């Protein structure tokens, strides 16, 4: 009997650096960024149904079901594969929305990979990543599941192998609008491209940080507090702020001091996502 239910992780990501090279004619920005995963994230549970209905059973405040990337991913995969089956989906949500750690994109990728497995479609990662790109620029890296240097709008991926420290991640209670940051006139848009691999350690700058810190005092405060213990960085356009530590004990110690006033968590960096490790264990 085939497996009809499946629970999969939906990991967070960090942008270890983010350089903006310029704006394209279509309005998108040319980027260079380095993605790494965290062993921390949401959890999605899927149950196959035979009537073709796609049903997300978890409510998201302010997000209509049909606008949710989970539902969009499921419907696109169903349509493009001509699959007659449907799916029930539940999510245990812990990743913040608008945090810059890839919550929605990761959920979409977990949905594509989970349904590909449950519906027995046999799609490879290239095909799933191409579909994922139509949902968002960050979806392909979650589909492929390996730390990567990304170019273009974030979709041209080259595997990378950065160190895997323990991270303290702070979550300022504010949702940052990516569109707002990328339209800010003071945003740096002319960083010279990095042409050396692996990415040199000195290139850890995030071009969005000055704009986000100026617009959002909550983010600026988190950067200042974490910066007392380690180099504090912004992931994506925020709002989440992170810093690396060589051991869990050190990360836990700093986190305990900071989370008295700020929300945050400790997680291990990983160059292979916990989603892909789980899928490999099912083979």
Curated annotation (Swiss-Prot):
EC class (word): transferase
Annotated metabolic or biological route of this protein: Isoprenoid biosynthesis; isopentenyl diphosphate biosynthesis via DXP pathway; isopentenyl diphosphate from 1-deoxy-D-xylulose 5-phosphate: step 3/6
Ligand binding (ATP): 96-106
Pfam families the UniProt entry points to: GHMP_kinases_C (PF08544), GHMP_kinases_N (PF00288)
EC number: 2.7.1.148
Key words of the record: ATP-binding, Isoprene biosynthesis, Kinase, Nucleotide-binding, Transferase
GO MF term (any one): 4-(cytidine 5'-diphospho)-2-C-methyl-D-erythritol kinase activity
Active site residues per record: 13, 138
Keyword Transmembrane helix: no
Example GO BP: terpenoid biosynthetic process
Catalysed conversion reaction: 4-CDP-2-C-methyl-D-erythritol + ATP = 4-CDP-2-C-methyl-D-erythritol 2-phosphate + ADP + H(+)
Family assignment from sequence similarity: Belongs to the GHMP kinase family. IspE subfamily.
Function: Catalyzes the phosphorylation of the position 2 hydroxy group of 4-diphosphocytidyl-2C-methyl-D-erythritol.
Protein name: 4-diphosphocytidyl-2-C-methyl-D-erythritol kinase
Originating species: Pseudomonas fluorescens (strain SBW25)
Source taxonomy: Bacteria, Pseudomonadati, Pseudomonadota, Gammaproteobacteria, Pseudomonadales
């Amino acid at each position: 009997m085939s497996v009809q239910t499946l629970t999969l992780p939906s990991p967070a990501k960090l942008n270890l650096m983010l350089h903006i090279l310029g704006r394209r004619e279509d309005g998108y920005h040319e980027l260079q960024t380095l993605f790494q995963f965290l062993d921390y994230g949401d959890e999605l549970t899927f149950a196959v149904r035979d009537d073709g209905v796609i049903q997300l059973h978890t409510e998201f405040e302010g997000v209509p079901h049909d606008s949710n990337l989970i539902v969009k991913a499921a419907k696109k995969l169903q349509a493009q594969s001509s699959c007659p089956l449907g799916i029930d989906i539940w999510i245990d949500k812990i990743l913040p929305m608008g945090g810059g750690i890839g919550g929605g994109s990761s959920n979409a990728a977990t949905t594509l990979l989970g349904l590909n497995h449950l519906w027995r479609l046999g799609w490879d990662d290239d095909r799933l990543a191409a579909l994922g790109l139509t949902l968002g620029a960050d979806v392909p890296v979650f589909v492929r599941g390996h730390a990567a240097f990304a170019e273009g709008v974030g979709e041209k991926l080259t595997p990378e192998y950065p160190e895997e420290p323990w991270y303290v991640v702070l979550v300022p209670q504010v949702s940052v609008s990516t569109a707002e940051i990328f339209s800010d006139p003071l945003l740096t848009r002319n960083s010279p491209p990095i042409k050396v691999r692996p990415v040199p350690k000195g290139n850890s700058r995030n071009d969005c940080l000055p704009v986000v810190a100026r617009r959002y005092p909550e983010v600026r405060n988190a950067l200042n507090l974490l910066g007392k213990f380690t180099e504090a960085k912004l992931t994506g356009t925020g709002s989440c702020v992170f810093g690396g530590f060589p051991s869990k004990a050190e990360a836990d110690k700093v986190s305990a001091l900071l989370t008295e006033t700020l929300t945050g968590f400790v997680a291990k960096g990983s160059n292979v996502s916990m989603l892909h490790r789980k899928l490999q264990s099912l083979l």
